[in-house]
A protein has these predicted regions:
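Short amphipathic beta-strand starts and helix->beta connectors
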Residues: 78-79, 124-126
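Non-catalytic DNA-recognition/assembly elements of restriction-modification systems
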Residues: 1-20, 144-188
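A short beta-sheet element
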Residues: 55-115, 134
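N-terminal alpha-helical segment
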Residues: 9, 39, 88, 102, ...
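Active-site donor-binding loop signature of nucleotide-sugar glycosyltransferases
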Residues: 32, 97, 143
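Sequence-specific dsDNA recognition surfaces
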Residues: 6-64, 79
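A short glycine-rich beta-alpha junction/loop motif
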Residues: 86-92, 126-155
């Protein structure tokens, strides 16, 4: 096993500011409130006309959307779908990995408790109306990075855990619905 190497985050990814130039009649607008703890919550198409000025950024599959505002609110998402007609708010960083890091590995690093705490502390240290970070501040954070093969093993392991957590949530939701149905049948 090779030794892990230290990198600044800016050495393994870029912030993407590609303006959406598509001409689809309908698009999906993604704001900071539409991403949470890894998921993109909004997939509702709206008419592509008179769009508010904040919706400009194009993104694609395997990109990471990360809110510039209040990192501790966990407003980030890994894009695991084709996003041709999706447009992100300018308050979301679009982060794209390079060939040194797997996109999902980078996502796991950026959403880790330790990284979120560091970014929140940086955000709170800035003057302004609300805690905010920039890609420049993110880019100088250092991480230890294994070789790609090891990253793949780590991602597989973490995805397995995430799948089990998601399954448990679905089971809990189902049990809650069953309990409510029983309660209604007994007491209503």
């Amino acid at each position: 096993m090779e030794e892990w190497k230290q990198y600044n985050i800016g050495e393994i990814c870029d912030t993407i500011s590609e303006t959406y130039k598509g001409n689809a009649s309908d698009v999906v607008l993604i704001n900071t409130s539409d991403v949470l703890e890894g998921k993109c919550l909004n997939h509702t198409f709206v008419a592509n006309k008179n769009l508010r000025g904040q919706f400009k950024k194009q993104f694609k599959k395997n990109d990471i959307l990360y809110s510039e505002i209040r990192p501790a609110n966990k407003r980030y998402a890994f894009i695991d779908f084709e996003s041709t007609d999706y447009i992100a708010s300018t308050k979301l960083m679009v982060i794209r990995s390079n060939d040194k890091v797997l996109p999902k590995y980078l996502y796991y690093v950026l959403q880790s408790k330790e990284m979120v705490e560091v970014l929140q502390m940086l955000a709170e240290s800035r003057s302004g109306t609300f805690p905010q970070i920039t890609f420049s501040e993110l880019a100088i954070q250092t991480i230890l990075l294994p070789e790609i093969r090891e990253q793949s093993k780590i991602v597989d392991f973490l995805e397995s855990i995430d799948s089990k957590i998601a399954l448990n949530r679905r089971i809990n939701d189902n049990l809650e619905q069953q309990a409510q149905a029983l309660f209604k049948s007994w007491f209503v």
